[in-house]
Amino acid sequence: MSYARERSQPYQPGQTVPYKLSRSKIELFMQCPRCFWLDVRLKITRPSSPPFNINKAIDELFKKEFDRYRAEAKPHPLMLDNQIKAVPYQHKDLNTWRYNFTGITTLHKPTNLHIFGAVDDVWVNDAGELIVVDYKATAKDKPVTQLGPEGSWHDMYRRQMEVYQWLLRQNGFAVSDTGYFVYATGRQDLDGFNNKVEFRTYVFPHHGNSDWVEQTINDMKACMESDEMPPMGTAAMGGPCEFCTYARQRTELTLRALKSQKKS
């Protein structure tokens, strides 16, 4: 049985029809060009993990909460508490921007790649600039009040926000370099569960720079056009790509086993 997935067609070198790539595929390329190439050229994708349904529920509740203030064109209390001079942005396409399978879209004409990504929320400041907002949820002993240092796995979150900033700019919007993470941390210091989880929520900025996105898309296209499988990349938490490492070790073990069977 082939592990290739047929949700979309593999990329054909030189094709004239625009090819659709999500924000997550950009992140995949940044981590491991080999896994990216196998995905888009052969539709051999990484094994999927179970969905984080608790995180998804928190995202949806945050959206409902901010939408109430959006309808009234008023700042959310978290925005007031953090002296953020902005309100949730009202736009007819907001729900499309937030939907995973549509998102904010643009056709990158130099590569003929259709790039899209679903944003959690958008605010607008007093200067009329759009602010990209990303909701995050976790559970730790201490609340998350800032991202980890550059070079850590939190760089994934930085790149995520910067791609959304780039996408909005490609659609003609004035976008602030400063985005915000609304980070909810589940408390583990309480006496018991008692059928509920309490969260401590912090809002903190990220000063994004999306200059890297353009060159990365060009590099992705060059990778897609090549018939040579690129080198192995890195794992999200550092070190060599775990998926490529596993695939290589399992293949080597399988080949040794088959060779041994032939001898016997």
Q: Which residues are covered by each model-predicted region?
A:
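Mg2+/Mn2+-dependent nuclease catalytic core
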Residues: 97-215
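Metal-dependent nuclease catalytic cores that hydrolyze phosphodiester bonds in DNA/RNA
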Residues: 1-129
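Serine-centered coil/turn micro-motif
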Residues: 49, 76, 155, 240-244
